[in-house]
């Protein structure tokens, strides 16, 4: 395909006499609507930052001028509050309104540490400060907090108790402790932690350079302090790991079987080759692991890991892999042992850029951990399936009195179990997605997915999982997964939302089901975003059904939030098919009160004119029809050398008298067609225009009108000749041109008034006809 494109470019440079035709071809290819399945990958609704502010569905945190880099969030649904970790600051915010009565703690790094950090060559603004990376609930009244401390991690406790009906929000500066192996040194390093039973489980780097990575357990009740970490001497365990998520997931109803699962990516080297690849992994350890008795002392004795596969199967048998895990989200189910695992992955290739979402089941993950182990003779060998004897109890099994009364803790494990786990921590089989491949993917776009949260929504026609996907350019994609026949899935992109004023990578997202809000952090700000904006879809039943948004339904008067209820109500919604014809039985009334926009446009013969028509839905296919003057029949307009269809409307070059008439812009989604714009075009004959021009030449009105018309015609030619020049840029240019024109009008008038004040010093004054053209008009 690239070779063909190069040939076309070469031909265009050689055959310059074909330039106008090639311009027309490139314009047509650039702007013609995309049809078929590709349309479904286009967000149906695209809202800018300004649109979100106007709809009151986006609230930016305004107290952020004192601290940036908002990558740590702790959601407290029960008390309706949000803790925000930033640069040198910790904020306590309300889930209802981020800017209402918020509190803050200023916690900078020690001055001597900042100076040492600078001497080490680190950046004073982006590295040599105290970036808050750990916010974990320690108990009902305290939060455990850690910061990078200018590459010297430090931890402490925040008091969140109540005193005289007022919330205490205070850092205990008298009980600060080292944050090594609890918090990363580098504020940009991927990191994961979870607190359970007053134990902190962390995946991070243990040194200044970030080379030694470890998964650790620290803290705990004062009477039972067990510090455990991965074995640094065994490179099979972890190799440059980047930790993404850590979770407590019970395996059975027996609490002795409780495990901590952690997700990460790491480097891997196969055989004697020097090439290293990035692989995504899931690992697990037992909560009751206290290390070995004679070997692996204060090291995990139940550590296992397996590969996570997220790939697109190729027709030739070669898969396309998304190997770099970026984020993990666990969607709760009724069974706390079996949450649905959602993962965001990206490609490692600099040529083939893409992102994907893969979904896994805990049953499949457990099956891999209960399967065969991988074996490697030495660093120069490849991983193979281990076929030897497996010691008892099975390595990776949690000690339990019900399993074996003689093994009460990991210190009771036989030596052969400890020796086996040191060399065989990798499982031979990999974990594959439940769908066999990605549930959602984005390929060759100008952004990558970075974050994900998922909401399970009950709609009128079923239950749906709605994904909110953050990107590295500060946008959020709202995607619904729809089950089709034969176990096929359809992914519909409902919205693309620009939640930040300027492009900024999304670092963290938290979902509040009670508030129906998303809380999104980036390096430049924090935003509170509503899960739904039903009123933006339109004012008709058809618009609401076409949206296919599980959150929204037609209530008879408007598109509003759908709430499941036992009462019988006339709520119309069709998420599965998006067919308003079956849902909106009073469809004619629904469309009639919508009323398409009607405008009258005048064009000058032999000049060009543009008929604007921008559908609200980007998934709609536009067709143009004309009803010529004196004719009752409508005919569809086909593009040719004079008529060019663009994504913004219809460009008609060299207007003719026969072009006069009523133009209908119709949008089609699925089987539903409706008119969104009616335009009456009146073509003024060139001879008539010249007569008018001569009659009004003294005032110069028509002259300016023609100049503006010719200028715009030249601009359209510029759009045709430059594929990189969009209509958005044209409109921006026209806006600035109008501003300059108004300033030019106002400036000379003011200057003229000043001259009138000084008329006693002048003998003659200019007449209006002698003034510059900008004033005369």
UniProtKB/Swiss-Prot annotation:
Protein name stated in the entry: Semaphorin-3D
Gene Ontology cellular component annotations, sorted alphabetically: extracellular space; plasma membrane
Intrachain S-S bonds: 117-128, 146-155, 286-398, 310-358, 534-552, 665-731
Alphabetically ordered keywords of this record: Developmental protein, Differentiation, Disulfide bond, Glycoprotein, Immunoglobulin domain, Neurogenesis, Secreted, Signal
GO BP terms, alphabetized: axon guidance; negative chemotaxis; neural crest cell migration; positive regulation of cell migration; semaphorin-plexin signaling pathway
Region feature Disordered, mapped onto this chain: 738-777
UniProt-annotated glycosylation sites, renumbered to this chain: 139, 607, 724
Organism of origin: Homo sapiens (Human)
Domain Sema intervals: 44-531
Gene3D superfamilies: Immunoglobulins, ligand-binding face of the semaphorins, domain 2, YVTN repeat-like/Quinoprotein amine dehydrogenase
Skewed-composition ranges (Basic and acidic residues): 766-777
Domain comment, as recorded: Strong binding to neuropilin is mediated by the carboxy third of the protein.
Function: Induces the collapse and paralysis of neuronal growth cones. Could potentially act as repulsive cues toward specific neuronal populations. Binds to neuropilin.
Entry annotated with the keyword Magnesium: no
SUPFAM superfamilies documented for this protein: Immunoglobulin, Plexin repeat, Sema domain
